[in-house]
Amino acid sequence: MKIAVIGAMEEEVTILRSKLEQTNREVIANCEFTSGFYEGKEVVLLKSGIGKVNAAMSTTILLDRFKPDVVINTGSAGGFHHSLNVGDIVISTEVRHHDVDVTAFDYEYGQVPNLPAAYKADNALIQAAEDEASELGHIQVVKGTIATGDSFMSDPDRVAFIRGKFEDLYAVEMEAAAVAQVSYQFNTPFVVIRALSDIAGKESEISFDQFLEQAAKHSTDLVLRMIKRIN
């Protein structure tokens, strides 16, 4: 079993990288791939860069060259659901684009033509995350829809617009739908694990700077537990 873990930023991958043994580092198209082992499991860690194009390009390289059996996308996100607070973790049930609009041709809002409107996370990976979440103690862990777009959600008007498009949205960020779309095309199971660094629209940029490290630690803690469980 080879497990791929993808984070966009250095803060989102640094803890996991430090835990890997027998590592080998490669840089391909300015994307950093670190292969190694954690608790006897083979892991490929990708630092993808920020945004959907970087995520799609690097995930394609990852799946084509390294051929992992499963993909876990980790890192930070902005909270959308009223029940969430900074530091909470969202496990994806499905992932959607929030900045794609081809509704003029009868596609759903967020749907790329000829592809699913929503990319469903793998049930076994969701279950592994849920099983390990109970060991995290005081951290609230929920599961739900995560949406992706190439914008940081600090504008209240934009937040209200996106809320109007998706009934039950838990978190937003800038890479997961690209990772999910490429994983779907390669028929590779995936799940997204994101901890909240901010609440969308509420001084998000200030909160992000303050709480990115905490969010990265929370999401990495769960991912490390998952790696030990996945067979």
From Swiss-Prot:
The Gene Ontology biological process annotation of the record reads:
L-methionine salvage from methylthioadenosine; L-methionine salvage from S-adenosylmethionine; nucleoside catabolic process
Which InterPro entries would you find in this protein's record? MTA_SAH_Nsdase (IPR010049), Nucleoside_phosphorylase_d (IPR000845), Nucleoside_phosphorylase_sf (IPR035994)
Q: Name the PANTHER family on file.
A: 5'-METHYLTHIOADENOSINE/S-ADENOSYLHOMOCYSTEINE NUCLEOSIDASE, 5'-METHYLTHIOADENOSINE_S-ADENOSYLHOMOCYSTEINE NUCLEOSIDASE
Q: Which residues make up the binding site for substrate?
A: 78, 153, 174-175
The reply on keyword Hydrolase is yes
The catalytic site is made up of 12, 198
| Gene Ontology MF: a single term | methylthioadenosine nucleosidase activity
Would you tell me the protein name for this molecule?
5'-methylthioadenosine/S-adenosylhomocysteine nucleosidase
Instruction: List the GO cellular component terms.
Output: cytosol
The EC number(s) this enzyme carries: 3.2.2.9
Reactions this protein catalyses:
S-adenosyl-L-homocysteine + H2O = S-(5-deoxy-D-ribos-5-yl)-L-homocysteine + adenine; S-methyl-5'-thioadenosine + H2O = 5-(methylsulfanyl)-D-ribose + adenine; 5'-deoxyadenosine + H2O = 5-deoxy-D-ribose + adenine
Organism annotation: Bacillus licheniformis (strain ATCC 14580 / DSM 13 / JCM 2505 / CCUG 7422 / NBRC 12200 / NCIMB 9375 / NCTC 10341 / NRRL NRS-1264 / Gibson 46)
